[in-house]
Amino acid sequence: MPSAFVMISCNFGSAKDVTSELHDIDGVEQVLIVSGIYDIIVRITVQNKDDLDRLLLRVRRMDEIQSTLTLIITQSQ
């Protein structure tokens, strides 16, 4: 099952609204508001690569999101 962290930069003042929307997406396990270059970190786990692609596309298309950086987890201990 593919898992990834997605770092998200969003429009100023929109982080809380974006997190609410992210929580409603199947496959989203955790949503964290952070400080720094990125505003939000999301942990996702899906059934297969196609589901991962669809979820990432859905996130990238959200109006308040400026950019994303995806880190696919290759090993977990």
Language-model region placement:
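A compositional/biophysical signature of low hydrophobicity enriched in polar/charged and small residues
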Residues: 1-77
